[in-house]
């Protein structure tokens, strides 16, 4: 079972990218579980046809200790297994702590057991590595390979670099490695070249460039992944390609994060800061 975490700055399209990629893997016949690690609890919506899933933390609050696995895991597109950790009530408690509680509960209830015959588990993790809780999949060896969703925008690259610092911090202890950058295009000038160069400097690869296409939003409005909504659309092939590249990937590195000056000079070199 491969344990994958998808990171990236808030609003970059992690949940969309994760679900569309998982749909591609499921279409290839892979058995996948998706663990949403975001208080918004939108990491599995498209795989479940828009169903707003009850989160692990909500279920715990309501049911107490009497929680069964089927209470917190739903079957989605092509038998993907979907669960959302959820978060505390706004303004109370720590969302990172919620992830720790949820993943521990999933382990206790046997969600990762061999009987499920999982090929992959994907963790879709909120925003930047802002606190120890959100770093938990990296820190405790829950995830072994990390992919960072970014774009050619300055803050997305800054966040990607910060996440690399988090991976570097825990690489020796947890055995976690960076599998590559996924460029979720925002149509920034020289975007592909800039992210390829950023990847090279960090010591990794840009595993795929996902072109911007409003069809992704159209599929989302219809509460589906692109592959589910229209398997013949060109954008569906982009996600199939990304799924295949992840499935075949053998490049796993300890990243070399850049100094802020290096990052800024990269932005200047490719014209974004001009």
UniProtKB/Swiss-Prot annotation:
UniProt keyword annotation of Secreted present: no
Maturation and modification: The reversible ADP-ribosylation of Arg-97 inactivates the nitrogenase reductase and regulates nitrogenase activity.
SUPFAM superfamilies linked: P-loop containing nucleoside triphosphate hydrolases (SSF52540)
Cofactor: [4Fe-4S] cluster
Assigned keywords, A-Z: 4Fe-4S, ADP-ribosylation, ATP-binding, Iron, Iron-sulfur, Metal-binding, Nitrogen fixation, Nucleotide-binding, Oxidoreductase
Positions with a binding annotation for ATP: 8-15
Any one Pfam family match given in the protein's UniProt record, by short name: Fer4_NifH
Gene Ontology terms describing biological process: nitrogen fixation
Catalytic reactions of this protein: N2 + 8 reduced [2Fe-2S]-[ferredoxin] + 16 ATP + 16 H2O = H2 + 8 oxidized [2Fe-2S]-[ferredoxin] + 2 NH4(+) + 16 ADP + 16 phosphate + 6 H(+)
PROSITE patterns registered for this protein in UniProt: NIFH_FRXC_1 (PS00746), NIFH_FRXC_2 (PS00692), NIFH_FRXC_3 (PS51026)
Broad class of enzyme this protein falls into: oxidoreductase
Modified residues (ADP-ribosylarginine): 97
Keyword Repressor in record: no
Cofactor remark: Binds 1 [4Fe-4S] cluster per dimer.
Coiled coil stretches, renumbered: none
Quaternary data: Homodimer.
NCBIfam families with a match to the protein in the record: nifH
Function in brief: The key enzymatic reactions in nitrogen fixation are catalyzed by the nitrogenase complex, which has 2 components: the iron protein and the molybdenum-iron protein.
Family: Belongs to the NifH/BchL/ChlL family.
Protein's UniProt name: Nitrogenase iron protein
High-level lineage: Bacteria, Pseudomonadati, Chlorobiota, Chlorobiia, Chlorobiales
